[in-house]
């Protein structure tokens, strides 16, 4: 037992020394710019940022949110180092496509809506209700086209600038808010019910990833990606 514990301690020390050596070699890359989806409401991203800041206090973290296409453009043109986003196109070989999770789709409905009494809701049933999307004004048409023609959400569409505004619209009975379980979702409160969205007898799932440019990758990006993956997958 002594030799096991001593050996484990030496391995931990060696790992820490290796991490520190790599870190010192990248001190000039002391900023990490993170983009995430405007509709993201999980808790793990914030936990990962906090833990990363504790481990690497020398790194300045800059965070921005946006729609899928806004984040994609920021990454392409060097506005951010890494983005947390959904997969909407085939993976590109120019980027690291770091898969986090296949996430279940949910609909947030007012408890006043009769559908809220069910255990799940069918995609076809939701077509009778306005779909509330979180989007900037400039990206509304893009988001509507994707949700309607790719995911199959029908009916009419309404837009909110952020999740708080979107949930207020739900409480007011104006429609439903589609959301994905990227990690741990916060409680919705007494006025809203969150139901799995199904096609037939299967819940709809979507892929969420971290993306970064292969040519601009570094140790800090990889460390942050590993932290977030562990938190989201509860490893």
PLM region descriptions:
Residues 2, 50-53, 124, 205-235:
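Extended ligand-binding regions for polar small-molecule ligands
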Residues 49-56, 125, 140-155:
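Ligand-binding cleft/hinge of the Venus flytrap
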Residues 1-13:
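Basic, amphipathic "hinge/linker" alpha-helix immediately C-terminal to the N-terminal HTH DNA-binding motif
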Residues 29-89:
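Central regulatory/effector-binding core of bacterial HTH transcription factors
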Residues 92-98, 103-104, 165-215:
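Beta-alpha-beta core module
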Residues 86, 129-152, 218-225:
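Secondary-structure junction motif
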Residues 25-26, 94-131:
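Flexible hinge/capping segments at coil-to-helix
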Residues 59-67, 86, 133, 153-165:
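Short beta-strand-to-loop elements that line the ligand-binding cleft
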